[in-house]
Amino acid sequence: MEAQRIQGTYQGLSLNKWWCWDSKSEWLYKCSAQKLVVVISNIESSEVLERWQFDIEGDKTAKDDSAARGKSQKTVQDEIRSVIRQITATVTFLPLLEVSCSFDLLIYTDKDLVVHEKWEESGPQFIISSEEVCLRSFTTTIHKVNSMMAYKTPVND
């Protein structure tokens, strides 16, 4: 697995940073992406403050089957909504980000995958001294997605 990344900033984010969404959709459909990570960092120090990780287990045979894989679209959407509600609820315990931040989008792909030149290889960008929170999982007809997030433990003065 290789991590491919593209960068953006919170302030003045241009939607053209997402030029490659078609690539990501294709990678997900072909089960070529195993992990999607959003890393939030302090712009000035480059210190990683939050890391949102979504591990993706793809079933390459599922998309070739003509029969549906036992889950209705409503069930899948309900599971995804549940994860989104849980992500939204993290504001109750996450430290407030009081610095200007940027984000990196990392996608761990098959090593032999050809990627656009705007993507570059990256390290995992782990957080030193972090707290980790496991979030709910969900499954679709092709994927199982496990999610977790880590955040920088506040330093007591």
Feature roles, as predicted:
Residues M1-D157:
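Long protein-protein interaction modules used by eukaryotic assembly/scaffold proteins
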